Amino acid sequence: SVGFKAGVKDYKLTYYTPEYETKDTDILAAFRVTPQPGVPPEEAGAAVAAESSTGTWTTVWTDGLTSLDRYKGRCYHIEPVPGEESQFIAYVAYPLDLFEEGSVTNMFTSIVGNVFGFNAVRALRLEDLRIPPAYTKTFQGPPHGIQVERDKLNKYGRPLLGCTIKPKLGLSAKNYGRAVYECLRGGLDFTKDDENVNSQPFMRWRDRFLFCAEAIFKSQSETGEIKGHYLNATAGTCEEMIKRAVFARELGVPIVMHDYLTGGFTANTSLAHYCRDNGLLLHIHRAMHAVIDRQKNHGXHFRVLAKALRMSGGDHIHSGTVVGKLEGEREITLGFVDLLRDDFVEKDRSRGIFFTQDWVSLPGVLPVASGGIHVWHMPALTEIFGDDSVLQFGGGTLGXPWGNXPGAVANRVALEACVQARNEGRDLAREGNEIIREASKWSPELAAACEVWKEIKFEFEPVDTI
């Protein structure tokens, strides 16, 4: 007789272990599972645990050569989703040894690599991950983090201001640099390459880097403040990306940028290491995130992508606005904003946080609010995001009727007015419009901006609900 029982057996016999007590070193995952009709929750949950760890569809004799008990993922808890008959949350624990140290790429390949195409489930969404300190400690994380960035820039006690240069495609390098200079001179801290600006025929990367560096140094000398422009180093190969980052360092600029989802985690982690070694800040754009996170019952929630970025490394990341054209749901957005900035975040299901997350000493990431925001949103943004954030106004700067520099002035005046009002104890949520109106009496630039955008709102139902 053979030494193992051949054939197909139910996953739940091996991978559903409700009595399992999770270890401090386990990586924990919360999946929203929509099973095929007729598949019981325990079997579907166990199937997810199996397919994302040691399992395959049939028993194999080589199982006898290893200790499955030591290496298997376990579905240890199942709970219903309120209001959704056909869905449930499956909690899965993965032993730490299943993952390569310091590789977000490997973590994702294991946890979400194969199982999402799996037949026993109709749809699957990874809602959250608990990353144990034992694993976090194998990552460098953000190149610098929030405090070091403030010290480098000498900017304290307020959110930072940015602006994406528009039109995003089509400007020549010289005109692009001019737009950068105008915004920085007017009072912004940063300007930004759009995520799709890499190195196209109308503007090659080296020319853009040169003219933007000139704009940075000229505006710095005129304003006496430290300025930056997120130079997008994203490229078709890792080698080319690093080459661009090296050139940025040689120019002496403070910050570069990367599209971490389209560029990939391997490239992103390499760039983050380079940035820490060479004193560059790293701005992260999340282009392509909605492909992964927008569907409510399939994909991976953005809070998972945000945690992954904090491990891979970045000093800023776009995180939705709560107001404006890319509206996130407020509590959920604030949940992952805290996961980006804080050292320790308590489990809180009302904010979509499924696990208590202890980041130990990993530096924090500044959330960037960007997309359809303008001066009238400033009080709400200051109130919601607090000091440790970057508020980015693209059209909200360049669309000011008098031009870029006055548009930048308007944003800076509005921000300073909001910060002062808050520090004086006024309620930004209630008195926001009044605060902006008062400030505009002293600033014609702000008054002009207020006039243009007095009625603009982008109002759609949020897609993401708990």
UniProtKB/Swiss-Prot annotation:
<dbReference type="GO" id="GO:0009507">
    <property type="term" value="C:chloroplast"/>
</dbReference>
<feature type="active site" description="Proton acceptor">
    <location>
        <position position="285"/>
    </location>
</feature>
<feature type="binding site">
    <location>
        <position position="286"/>
    </location>
    <ligand>
        <name>substrate</name>
    </ligand>
</feature>
<feature type="modified residue" description="N6,N6,N6-trimethyllysine">
    <location>
        <position position="5"/>
    </location>
</feature>
<dbReference type="InterPro" id="IPR000685">
    <property type="entry name" value="RuBisCO_lsu_C"/>
</dbReference>
<dbReference type="GO" id="GO:0019253">
    <property type="term" value="P:reductive pentose-phosphate cycle"/>
</dbReference>
<keyword id="KW-1015">Disulfide bond</keyword>
<feature type="site" description="Transition state stabilizer">
    <location>
        <position position="325"/>
    </location>
</feature>
<keyword id="KW-0488">Methylation</keyword>
<dbReference type="GO" id="GO:0004497">
    <property type="term" value="F:monooxygenase activity"/>
</dbReference>
<feature type="binding site">
    <location>
        <position position="318"/>
    </location>
    <ligand>
        <name>substrate</name>
    </ligand>
</feature>
<dbReference type="Pfam" id="PF00016">
    <property type="entry name" value="RuBisCO_large"/>
</dbReference>
<comment type="subunit">
    <text>Heterohexadecamer of 8 large chains and 8 small chains; disulfide-linked. The disulfide link is formed within the large subunit homodimers.</text>
</comment>
<comment type="function">
    <text>RuBisCO catalyzes two reactions: the carboxylation of D-ribulose 1,5-bisphosphate, the primary event in carbon dioxide fixation, as well as the oxidative fragmentation of the pentose substrate in the photorespiration process. Both reactions occur simultaneously and in competition at the same active site.</text>
</comment>
<feature type="binding site" description="in homodimeric partner">
    <location>
        <position position="114"/>
    </location>
    <ligand>
        <name>substrate</name>
    </ligand>
</feature>
<feature type="binding site">
    <location>
        <position position="164"/>
    </location>
    <ligand>
        <name>substrate</name>
    </ligand>
</feature>
<keyword id="KW-0120">Carbon dioxide fixation</keyword>
<dbReference type="GO" id="GO:0000287">
    <property type="term" value="F:magnesium ion binding"/>
</dbReference>
<keyword id="KW-0602">Photosynthesis</keyword>
<dbReference type="InterPro" id="IPR020888">
    <property type="entry name" value="RuBisCO_lsuI"/>
</dbReference>
<feature type="binding site">
    <location>
        <position position="168"/>
    </location>
    <ligand>
        <name>substrate</name>
    </ligand>
</feature>
<dbReference type="GO" id="GO:0009853">
    <property type="term" value="P:photorespiration"/>
</dbReference>
<dbReference type="InterPro" id="IPR017443">
    <property type="entry name" value="RuBisCO_lsu_fd_N"/>
</dbReference>
<feature type="binding site">
    <location>
        <position position="194"/>
    </location>
    <ligand>
        <name>Mg(2+)</name>
    </ligand>
</feature>
<dbReference type="InterPro" id="IPR036376">
    <property type="entry name" value="RuBisCO_lsu_C_sf"/>
</dbReference>
<feature type="binding site">
    <location>
        <position position="370"/>
    </location>
    <ligand>
        <name>substrate</name>
    </ligand>
</feature>
<feature type="modified residue" description="N6-carboxylysine">
    <location>
        <position position="192"/>
    </location>
</feature>
<keyword id="KW-0456">Lyase</keyword>
<dbReference type="Pfam" id="PF02788">
    <property type="entry name" value="RuBisCO_large_N"/>
</dbReference>
<keyword id="KW-0601">Photorespiration</keyword>
<keyword id="KW-0460">Magnesium</keyword>
<keyword id="KW-0934">Plastid</keyword>
<feature type="binding site" description="via carbamate group">
    <location>
        <position position="192"/>
    </location>
    <ligand>
        <name>Mg(2+)</name>
    </ligand>
</feature>
<keyword id="KW-0113">Calvin cycle</keyword>
<keyword id="KW-0479">Metal-binding</keyword>
<keyword id="KW-0560">Oxidoreductase</keyword>
<feature type="binding site">
    <location>
        <position position="195"/>
    </location>
    <ligand>
        <name>Mg(2+)</name>
    </ligand>
</feature>
<feature type="active site" description="Proton acceptor">
    <location>
        <position position="166"/>
    </location>
</feature>
<dbReference type="InterPro" id="IPR033966">
    <property type="entry name" value="RuBisCO"/>
</dbReference>
<keyword id="KW-0503">Monooxygenase</keyword>
<keyword id="KW-0150">Chloroplast</keyword>
<protein>
    <recommendedName>
        <fullName>Ribulose bisphosphate carboxylase large chain</fullName>
        <ecNumber>4.1.1.39</ecNumber>
    </recommendedName>
</protein>
